[in-house]
Amino acid sequence: GQAGKDVIWVPTPDEVVDRMLTMAQVTPQDFVMDLGAGDGKIAIAAAKKFGARAVGIEYNPEMAKHANANAAAAGVAGNGAGKATIRQADIFQTDIKEATVITLYLLPALNMKLRPQILAMRPGTRVVSHSFTMEDWEADEISSIDGRRAYFWMVPAQVMGNWTLEANNQRTDLALEQTFQKINGSVGIGPVHAGLRDTRLRGPFIQFSYVGQDRVRRDFTGRVDGAKMEGSFRDEKGGEGKWTAAKK
């Protein structure tokens, strides 16, 4: 191992790196940031095998130099798609918001210190961590590779609060509760607050259902865009249409 700022560097086995990047479904359209890059292995694989633009952040200057030499030896040094570069920097002083994929092999306390920054990223950003969790933010997938664990999350949109839902030229109050990617809530129909069913939030995509006073179930799917949502709905009698919602 090699000492970084807050972590002792231990290389991640190749098959774990592969699985991490596969879990994140990395493509040449992605910008992968590896936080705590060590020898650059994850950033190099993201560029070479997955065709992504990759940037590793490494605090130890010697290690960063070594990682860039590894990228050059692998034929992927540089910027742009299919290229990897390792920057000597502090991960907590680094702007990560442009990344579409974040990879981590840090200590639990560092994951937790980064967590607010990660949750503030663009909904749909993919995050993979080797060995360590994000505590009560449950992973969307856990893979095991020769006894080592890799955890995957997708940054959820922020939907908690009260919304005005418009569908079929009718307005209703939609109240949403949220704990990370888990959501629940109700729709106000006159004096009745009908509970939501089959709720799901995956990145910017939301779905929920409820049974109206007419005893008909309606299924809503849509996309969250800040203080707005829009999508389509269907009811079990074959009716369908568009819906929008605005945050109050």
Where are these regions (language model features)?
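Central antiparallel beta-sheet cores of small beta-barrel/beta-sandwich binding domains
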Residues: V159-K248
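Conserved class I S-adenosyl-L-methionine
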Residues: Q29-G38
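Active-site segment flanking the S-adenosylmethionine/decSAM binding pocket
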Residues: A84-R126
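S-adenosyl-L-methionine
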Residues: A64-E98
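Class I SAM-dependent transferase core
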Residues: G1-T27
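Glycine-rich SAM-binding Motif I of class I
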Residues: G40-I44
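Conserved SAM-binding motif I beta-strand of class I
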Residues: R53-E58
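C-terminal substrate-binding/active-site "lid" region of AdoMet-derived donor-dependent transferases
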Residues: A109-M160
